């Protein structure tokens, strides 16, 4: 199967390793890594938690949709998406049509460990929620959407970002052209 598209999109729940693997993919391919949440923060001058607080999740998702639309117009990029990017049909369509979609998975315990290590328990969907239960709930809702979009799927529980990035590139080259 050939897919003549040059962007690589990383999808999955928070703590799945999208940014870590994306950073290694960017180094190996000499491409620019974009993180959609960080790009939203740059554009607005506000952090994601503040946007959620002031505009609610709907306001954040609107900003996310605009950012995804802009980033999908670029070529030869690596994009680590926000975990909820799949909730919007337009996002799913644009991402699927403009690149190879890599779904990174991890156990809930691994995700919690990674999120805690990064000091990211302030994430908007964690505030006022039991973290483990919230991740399980998010996974139940989003997993079918991630799976439907995914061209390739990788578990990251025993993550070595460099090795996984190398394997992803090998698999992409074996499966698709022009990447």
From Swiss-Prot:
It catalyses: shikimate + ATP = 3-phosphoshikimate + ADP + H(+). Pfam families: SKI. Pathway: Metabolic intermediate biosynthesis; chorismate biosynthesis; chorismate from D-erythrose 4-phosphate and phosphoenolpyruvate: step 5/7. It comes from the Bacteria. Mg(2+) binds at residue 19. ATP binds at residues 15-20, 122. Substrate binds at residues 37, 61, 83, 142. Its EC number is 2.7.1.71. It is found in: Cytoplasm. One of its GO terms (molecular function) is ATP binding. CDD domains: SK. Monomer. This is Shikimate kinase.
């Amino acid at each position: 199967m050939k897919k003549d598209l040059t962007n690589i999109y990383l999808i999955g729940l928070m703590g799945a390793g999208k940014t870590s693997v994306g950073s290694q993919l960017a180094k190996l391919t000499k491409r620019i890594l974009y993180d959609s949440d960080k790009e939203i923060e740059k554009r607005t001058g506000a952090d994601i938690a503040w946007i959620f607080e002031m505009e609610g999740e709907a306001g954040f998702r609107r900003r996310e949709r605009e950012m995804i639309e802009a980033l999908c117009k670029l070529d030869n990029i690596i994009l680590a998406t926000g975990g909820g990017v799949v909730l919007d049909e337009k996002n799913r369509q644009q991402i699927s049509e403009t690149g190879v979609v890599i779904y990174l998975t991890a156990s809930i315990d691994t995700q919690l460990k990674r999120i805690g290590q990064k000091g990211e328990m302030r994430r908007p969907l964690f505030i006022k929620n039991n973290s483990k239960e919230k991740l399980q709930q998010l996974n139940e809702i989003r997993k079918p959407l991630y799976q439907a979009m995914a061209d390739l799927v990788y578990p990251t529980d025993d993550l070595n970002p460099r090795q996984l990035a190398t394997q992803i590139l090998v698999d992409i080259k074996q499966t698709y052209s022009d990447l």
